Amino acid sequence: MTRESGPGLPVEPETSPGFQGSRAPMRAGRPRPVREYAGLGSVAESNAWFKQLVASGSTSLPVAFDLPSRMGHDSDSPIASGSVGRAGVAIDSIDDMRVLFGGIPLAEVSTSLQIHARGGAPFLLLCQLVGEEQGVAAGRLAGTVQSDVLTEYVLKEYVEPEAYAFPPEPSMRLIADVFRYCEAEMPKWGTAAAGLDADEFAPRLSFLFASRTTVTDLAIEVRQAERLCKLRAVRDFLRVNDALVQLKRAAEGTDNVLYPMKEALAAYATVGEVWDVLREVWGTPSRAV
């Protein structure tokens, strides 16, 4: 059924079984797209795999992040030990994102950040910054970010209780900031919001089928820690500090935190440093959440 067909009318050529979309002709006569959930180990290894996917015709890159990245901890943090580069790629700074998407035409592929919106905000901004370095305006970048934070609080208590970063209220605020930011700066970036009409969001629904791989590689953790050490040695400390102060002020007030967050990441603040500022202001969730 398409919106144009009207209620009670048959849909052609998208008749059951085998619907290929909500609007005729959608993908009739074209191969069904395949988007592989990818990202494992070091950024260089993930980049090599992304290049293979693009060379084979993939137009979308769903990026898997490791647990420390999803939690907002840098790879050299003690809490990250043993988890760096496992079940996803480790991203700590803009340098990592440059390597991850090096040689990837971001104007021609979409990027799906397999991380909740409250955790995906810095990675969304890092994608924007790297895209702009490639000469791709933010308005041309396409991708998606998840936003099912309430489901996360219900399920992660039993599945992955350490994976959420903030209590529910500031988490919802951060998601709302992501929505507003994307609407203003990155209109082709897909977000999901409550209260939308089904006709508006249903045509943009997608599903992901994934398999599980487990890899233990201490060398990845060591290499990532070395990258962070070099980054902190050469960056402008005062610029980073000033940007993080502005982020803290925004978090304490009502301004959209994504704008100062972008400035901090552009100044080579790490994802963990950004998250530490927000944790200082917003706190962390209790086990009672």
Predicted segments with their positions:
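Long, highly charged low-complexity segments enriched in Glu/Asp and Lys/Arg with interspersed Ser/Thr
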Residues: 275-289
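Residue-level signal for alpha-helical context at structural boundaries
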Residues: 115-118, 145, 261, 265, ...
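Generic surface-pattern signal
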Residues: 55, 180, 233, 249-252, ...
